[in-house]
Amino acid sequence: MLTIDHLTKTYGDKKAVDDLTLHIAPGEIYGFIGHNGAGKTTTLKACAGILPFDAGEIRVAGVDMKTRPLDGKRLLAYLPDNPDLYDYLSGIQYLNFIADVFGVDKDTRAARIRDLANRFVLTEDLAQPISAYSHGMKQKLAMISAWLHEPKLILMDEPFVGLDPVASHLLKEMMRQHCDRGGAIFFSTHVLEVAEKLCDKVAIIRQGKLVASGTMDEVKGNASLEDVFLELEENHDA
């Protein structure tokens, strides 16, 4: 579903992502773990087609994101850590705008918006301007917009930060359901307990370089993910 092959991205003389190779298969929830500045957000933005990169290839369902970026973007949704929505629109206007962009017909979008807004308890707020939304409400609206066109791949940057427990539980359910239907999810997180319970596979990145990846058992063995992460950090600092 998502193939990252020798990805390199440089800012000035610093390699934010250094020769990164990963493969996320259909049906997988893949966690991306690392400290702030490790290269997680840069990688996700490159995969989403909104950040040019210096070397390597990124393919979404076989579509090359460098040569066919529009075709690739139609197959995915990207949720940044701080959704930058159009504050002058109402919630429903924003969702209709997203549906228009992805060519979702009116009957289909109405049914999906109704279902998703009910699940996120946002129905009564859709008529309100986004400028009146709290951070948590904006996150929920962004999540509805991500699922609205039923993408094959969903990319998320720290999706659980700021969510209340009910919304967090719902998001986990929706992530699993999406992958059970053959989709894939690649998301960054610093909440190791969430990754340990939710992910089929994880990758750990440090200073732009991949230091561990694989199934949870392959990466952590009998230890906790937190122990493995800290041990890798200590080994690289030594």
At which residue positions do the language-model features occur?
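Catalytic Walker B motif of ABC-type/P-loop ATPase nucleotide-binding domains
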Residues: 154-158
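Conserved ABC ATPase "signature" region
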Residues: 96, 100, 108-125
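Conserved ABC transporter NBD signature motif
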Residues: 56-67, 71-72
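ABC ATPase "signature
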Residues: 213-214
